[in-house]
Structure formats: C-alpha cells, structure tokens
C-alpha cells in the first residue's frame, strides 16, 4: 500500500478583522493501511484533513507526503496518484454526457480520440453504466451520478482514492451500492463518512473533533470513542 505522511501538518485561515482561525491542529500521522476511515461531526475538520491528501487544501504548517512526494511542491504528480471523490457529484460532472465526462478524465493520458472513447466505454461498463453512455449526466439517479463521478476518478488509475462523504446525499440502497463499490477497490481508500457501519469496515479510523485527531484506532474502537463524544 502507498504511504501517506502528515508531518506537523496544520491548517489556519485568515478571517478579516478577526486574525486567524485554526481549522486543523498540527497533525502527525503515517497512514499505510488499505482502508482508512475518518469520522467526526460537521465542521470538525475531517474534510480539511482529507483534502490535504491531494492538495485541494495546502498545509499552512508542516508538510504532507504521498509516497515521498510533497503535496505542496509536487501537486500535479500527487493528483495523478490520489483521486478525490466529492460529496456532491455535481462538483465533478461537468460534461454533457456520461461517456464525455469519463473521456475528460482521460484526455491527458490517451491522446487518440477513438482510443479514448473505447477506454471510456470500458470504464463505464465496469460500473454498470454502459447503457447510459450517451445519456445526460443530469438524467441519472443520485447513486448513478456518484458512481459516474467515481468512474471518472478511477479512469486515471490512481493508487489512492479519497472519498469525502460520498453517500451523504444518497438513499439506503444507493449508499450500500456506492459503499460496496469503494470497498471492492484495489486502491488504498481514505473514506470520510458519517456512516458508522462503513467506518467499521475500515482497518483504521481517525476520529476528528474540534480540528484535532482525538482517536486513532481500529474501526470498532474508534467508533466507540466517537459515539462517546457525541453522547457526552
């Protein structure tokens, strides 16, 4: 598995007229497990932590390394290694049709249009979306849109997939479908979630509270800690 390292990484933001606010306290972590969960309340800093891993957010202190690559200095190279799946697939689906959206992900790696189209169709088929290749992305169900967004991420063959609350907008059936798809991946998975059943499937779970990692344990142990925080 790849190695993700946070070496004194923290995030502060400037607030006009109010100085700075700490979003994520200085954090030291080495993540090598195949399935890593991140849980915490809304606004706890868990999404900030996840976004550090592919450079969507840059640390204001310390550094983040992915297989030895500094995210702040080697952002383009890191983003080829780390695919990111957002909560709302609308943040990722920008082309008119499904096949065009996957082709967009492949535009740098496959220059020939016919070859790119063929590969995009293979990717869609792998996610049960081949019959929707020429459909508008807006005609898909919520679960299908999230699977399409994930397909676009996986098309570039990353070694790590970071999924930031990918099932928050989905019903139970689609939540199960997307979650099972994520856990079937060969890639290392970092899953930010409110779904404690999904978190329990992870090898390691980080609990984030008030901008700090307050627990770093196995899935069941970390969830028990988190539930204790919520029930205080």
Annotate each PLM feature.
Residues 136-140, 144:
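Conserved ABC ATPase signature
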Residues 161-165:
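Catalytic Walker B motif of ABC-type/P-loop ATPase nucleotide-binding domains
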